[in-house]
Amino acid sequence: MKKQYVTVGTETISSNIFRKILRPLNNYTFKPTGGLWAAEFNKYIISDWYEYMITKDSYLQTLKSFKVAAIFTLKDDAKILTIDSCNQIKELAKKYPSYHHILGLCEPLTTKNKIFDFEELSREYDGVYINYYGINFSREIETFKNWSINTLLLFNIDCIEKYQSINIMPQNPYDSE
């Protein structure tokens, strides 16, 4: 069976909701804007991201709908770059250097916060899969420390094979039925 991913907060995946990937505006989180953000689907907890939003981040709960989601699979020829090592981040920073975040400098630049240009990367790949747990375990590079979980970020939704809408309304423990 193909690996399934889930994006929370929308029940449809279309060009109408998709925004072009843009470089990080600052170096506070090093996160780009746009794209389609997702996590691996888990039939018991929906995803690590859903679990994180429900249990850890009440601010996100005010911004995002937790009632709907879309589960999807990727086409076999989808070009997804898996980032799972600190050396790989260093190499990407050399190959796709980014200087735009300096305009919104929030933290001093160090050898621990390497950044690369997501817009340039999107010209070559359909998306990136960030192995957050593998990268952050070493603490050598802190570029992805604020990503919270393993994350799939799609730059191009044409790499999606199919998707299915799901209702993920949490059960109210006070309901009698």
Positions of predicted regions on the chain:
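Extended catalytic/binding region for NAD+/ADP-ribose chemistry, centered on the ART fold
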Residues: 23-65
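Active-site and NAD+-binding cores of ADP-ribose-processing enzymes
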Residues: 1-24, 55-177
